[in-house]
């Protein structure tokens, strides 16, 4: 009798631990990350938000980017997938950089502003530009 009570209590304990673990994982799942240059979001630059995305996710994460000019060379690595980068407006949400082929002989292919290596990456309502001076070719 004592053995069956002990087994029953152990089963309940294990079920409780398992349910707590599942609940904690659901609480950690974040579907939207907010980027804002002025500090009103969770991140001040887009690269930080991309780096916060979990590797090889099976659900979609939206990185919402508030209006602003984001001067950064953005790289979305191969292990990042199922991500939407959504700007507040195409006219006022701008990702920009100013590399050109003649800087340290980097060549044209390294002058990107955004490099996407991951799969299922979507961009909406934002502008991506290379605003390099007319000193050399740029992507």
Per-region residue spans from a language model:
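Bacterial Sec-dependent N-terminal signal peptides
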Residues: 1-28
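Short active-site-proximal "capping" loops at secondary-structure junctions
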Residues: 68-72, 90-92
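Flexible, charged surface loops at secondary-structure boundaries
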Residues: 27-29, 55-58, 78, 116
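Right-handed parallel beta-helix/beta-spiral solenoid domain characteristic of secreted/periplasmic
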Residues: 37-42, 62, 81-138
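Acidic Gly/Asp/Thr-rich repetitive segments characteristic of extracellular carbohydrate-active
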Residues: 30-64
């Amino acid at each position: 009798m004592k053995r069956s009570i002990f087994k029953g209590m152990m089963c309940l304990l294990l079920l409780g631990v398992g349910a707590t673990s599942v609940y904690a994982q659901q609480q950690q799942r974040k579907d939207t990350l907010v980027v804002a240059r002025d500090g009103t979001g969770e991140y001040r630059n887009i690269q930080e938000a991309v780096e916060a995305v979990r590797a090889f996710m099976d659900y979609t994460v939206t990185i919402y980017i508030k209006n602003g000019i984001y001067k950064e060379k953005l790289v979305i690595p191969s292990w990042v997938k199922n991500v939407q980068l959504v700007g507040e407006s195409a006219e006022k949400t701008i990702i920009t950089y100013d590399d050109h082929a003649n800087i340290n002989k980097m060549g044209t292919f390294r002058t990107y502003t955004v490099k996407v290596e991951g799969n299922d990456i979507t961009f909406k309502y934002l502008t991506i530009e290379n605003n390099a001076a007319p000193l050399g070719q740029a992507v």
